[in-house]
Structures are given as structure tokens and as C-alpha cells.
Amino acid sequence: DEVQAALSGQFDTGATAHELTVGTSAFRRVVDNRTAINEWIGSGNIDSEPEDFARYDGPLNDSHRRLDSRQYGLFFNDRISFNEQWQTVLGGREVRLDERTFDDQGDTGRHTRRYEFLPQAALIYKPVSNLSLYTRYSKGLSLGGTAPWFASNAFEILAPTVSRQIEAGIKYDWRRISLSATLYQIRQAYQYSRPNDDGTFTYVQQGEQKNTGLELAANGWASERLQISASVAAIRSRVTGSGTAEYEGHQTINVPTLRASLYGDYALPWVDGLAVLGGVQYSGKKYASQQGNVQADAYAIFNIGSRYSTRI
């Protein structure tokens, strides 16, 4: 659940124009789970026709609260225009985090209380009206991961983590299409099941995952009736400081090196308000194991549909 109140306004300080937004927010997230039931019912190979195993039909365990997370924040954002070419955006959010986790008996497992300031800043330069160059830095607060069932701390919910993103890009408006290129880097805590000497695993936050990418995109109207959205991104993802050498030095699990998408929305000329939709999402090969010794093939997902809009 989330509630937010904000106040926006414009004013000048000499030759400098300001677009200021200030506000407050409150966010609450609760997680209620049943204790998992794990029973061995057989085994099979994914390369062959899957076996038909009988489904579990026994009683379910009681549901209980595992997480109660609350965030209270004050935020501001000021877009400052110095002239027609130069702008800057300065802002931030002060967050008060109060989060509790609970075990199967309802006792408090972790109680995290802390303040976190999440700044954001951007510098924008427009040499001409339809061309923008920018650089941006931001800091975010991400939800902590949940330990898998096989970990020694199974179903434990870890504390929220702080991520940092820096990017630089260029945007060009050509006719009714917006073209952009963005170079970015995201740093975040690495959350994974760490192998122990006794053969067990413990789900931890240790080390850092760094994603560096280049994304090209085009959005807008290709014709009077056809609207398109296209993007392609190359991503390099690495883990450092995890304490597990086999998980480092290669592309991070489940992160493809190439990703692309294309969507179209075409308004049919013979029926007012009726349009056909279509798109494709492509994901390149990616590792399916943290050691980087098992690889999942590339795949594409196709979508097709229609929409109709009218006024009543």
C-alpha cells in the first residue's frame, strides 16, 4: 500500500527558472506465507518428455506473517533552467525505514530501523531545440531478496539494499519519432546462495553486481496510423567480492548480453477506433548457473492483439 502527497510550483530567482516539487509519502509492504511443504515425488530429465507425477493432496500449513516493511519519506525535485540550452535537476528523498521479519512462530527475526537519503541529479544540454545531451546520477532503495527453500536460512527475507546508477545519453526528436542512445552503469548488492564447506547453502548479501550497458531506442509515430516502440541493449554484468571465485569473472546468471524489443500499434483506416497490436521480445543466450557452466539458449516472444476505443 502506498500514499503520496505532493505540491508543485514554478518561480524565478533572477534569470533562473525553477520547477519545484515537494512532498511526502508512506509505503507499507507485508508478506504472509504458508510454511513450505517439500516432499520427494520423483525425478526426470528436462531433455525428455516430462514425467506425470501425482500432485500433493495433503493439508496445507497455516499462513503467518513473514514481513512487515514500512517506509516514510520526504522528497523534493527542482528542475532549474539557466537558459534555453542548460538545465539541471536536483532532488532527493529522505526515507525512514522500519522493517520487521518474523519466524514460523511469529517471533521477530530481524528489526531494521534506519534513515537513508537517496539523491538524484542530472545535467541537460540542448544545443538545438530537438537535441538533448544529458548525464544523470541516482541512488535507490531495493527490496531484499528471500532465501530459497534449500538454503540453511530458508525463506529468510534480507534487509533492503542500496543501488546506484549513473548514465549518460543523447536524445534526438526527428519528425514525430524520438531517437535515443544511453550508456549506463548500475551497482547493487549481490544476493545469492553461498556454498558452505559442509555442502549446504546460505542465502546472503555479499559482494557487488555491476551491470554496464548501452541501449538504443526509438519511439513515436512512423506514419499517421502506425506507432512504434523499439529498443536494443547490450549488457555486461559482473560480480565481484562475493567470496565465491567460481561465481565471478563471467556474465552474471540470468542476465543476457543482448536484449531487444519491437512493438507496433496500427490504427485500421476502415473502422474508427480499432487498432491491431503486435510485438516481439528477444533475449540472447544467458547463463543458467552461477558458475557459468550451463547456458540457456536465446529465445523470442511474439505478441499479437487488438484494441478498440470509443467515447460514451
Question: Model features per residue range: what roles?
Answer:
Residues F11-G14, I80-E84, F117, Y125-S129, ...:
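Outer-membrane beta-barrel strand-turn architecture
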Residues A5-G9, L74-I80, A121-Y125, A168-Y172, ...:
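Residues on the lipid-exposed face of transmembrane beta-strands in outer-membrane beta-barrel proteins
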Residues D68-Y72, R113-F117, V162-I166, D173-R175, ...:
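Residues that define the transmembrane beta-barrel architecture of outer-membrane proteins
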Residues T24-V30, E94-D98, Y137-L143, W174, ...:
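Transmembrane beta-strands of outer-membrane beta-barrel pores
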Residues D1-D103:
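Face-selective signature of the C-terminal outer-membrane beta-barrel domain
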Residues K126, S132-Y137, A159-W221, A233, ...:
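Membrane-embedded beta-barrel scaffold of Gram-negative outer-membrane proteins
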Residues L20-T24, L90, A121, T135, ...:
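Membrane-embedded beta-strand positions of outer-membrane beta-barrel proteins
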Residues N83-Q85, S178, Q185-R187, V204-Q290:
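Gram-negative outer-membrane beta-barrel transporters
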